């Protein structure tokens, strides 16, 4: 889901508001693109390039939205735990703990919760509990200096503090290669000294973040990739292709890739 840029006050209906915040709840992870380049021809809504400020602006809106959700859960749990049901006592205590954490401006994913508390929170579909990848969007001519780029360092430090992932890519380059044929694209990337495109880098990071892998099936007329959770066993992987394959699964055979080729 491509969510348009959020502004201050989005959690209270400013800009594109709550409608777009609700779309994020349906996602498995959030890819947060952060501007890390200077260009006088591209105006910034706040008048300057400051990755830390931009990240804080978005994160606070998500935190505010989550505070509203947790507050409603807390009110409901407080009313129901009077019945003596321990379920609602635990829910109220978890909501109180998490609300205090959110109130300090921190995302839910950094709150130290027990397994039981996390199981409760998982059912609330909080925005700031979702795994995040920060994408530092750099200029085309900054690719050689990613590791020494101060703006990228800022994003990486924030990602580290939040237990999030971070990749640096140039959206400008991605736009240029999007319309190229495969051979032309490979040659272009080679000239830039890049092993793989930013999109491929981002996809790999997303797979890692969500604990996913792919396996391939190949035939005379089709080659296809199937996405499964890391650690999925062979019968369940076969079931992704067709349920009959899982029901009738007999065995998996290990073959060296060189032999397969």
What is the meaning of each model-derived region?
Residues 1-32, 36-59, 113-124, 148-151:
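Switch II of P-loop NTPase G domains
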Residues 2, 20, 31, 70, ...:
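Residue-level signature of catalytic and energy-coupling elements of molecular machines
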Residues 9, 42, 73, 144, ...:
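Active-site-proximal flexible loops/turns
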Residues 26, 61, 66, 157-162:
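Substrate-engagement module of ASCE P-loop NTPases
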Residues 58-62, 171:
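A ubiquitous short alpha-helical element
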């Amino acid at each position: 889901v491509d969510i348009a840029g959020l502004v201050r006050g989005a959690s209270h209906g400013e800009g594109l508001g709550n409608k777009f915040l609700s779309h994020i709840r349906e996602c498995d992870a959030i890819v947060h693109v952060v501007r890390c380049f200077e260009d006088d021809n591209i105006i910034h809504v706040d008048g300057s390039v400051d990755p830390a400020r931009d990240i804080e602006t978005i994160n606070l809106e998500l935190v505010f939205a989550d505070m509203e959700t947790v507050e409603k859960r807390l009110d409901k749990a407080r009313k129901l735990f009077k019945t003596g049901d321990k379920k609602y006592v635990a829910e109220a205590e978890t909501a109180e703990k998490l609300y205090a954490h959110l109130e300090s401006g921190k995302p839910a994913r950094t709150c130290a919760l027990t397994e039981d508390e996390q199981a409760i929170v998982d059912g609330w579909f909080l925005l700031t509990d979702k795994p995040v990848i920060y994408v530092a969007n750099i200029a085309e001519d900054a690719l050689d200096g990613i590791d020494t780029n101060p703006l990228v360092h800022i994003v990486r430090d924030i990602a580290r503090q939040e237990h999030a992932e971070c990749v640096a890519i140039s959206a400008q380059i991605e736009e240029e290669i999007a319309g190229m044929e495969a051979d032309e694209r490979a040659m272009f990337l080679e000239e830039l000294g890049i092993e793989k495109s930013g999109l491929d880098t981002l996809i790999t990071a997303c797979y890692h973040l969500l604990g996913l892998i792919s396996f391939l099936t190949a035939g005379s007329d089709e080659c296809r990739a199937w996405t499964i959770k890391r650690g999925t066993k062979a019968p369940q992987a076969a079931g992704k292709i067709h349920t009959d394959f899982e029901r009738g699964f007999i065995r998996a055979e290990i073959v060296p890739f060189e032999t397969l080729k």
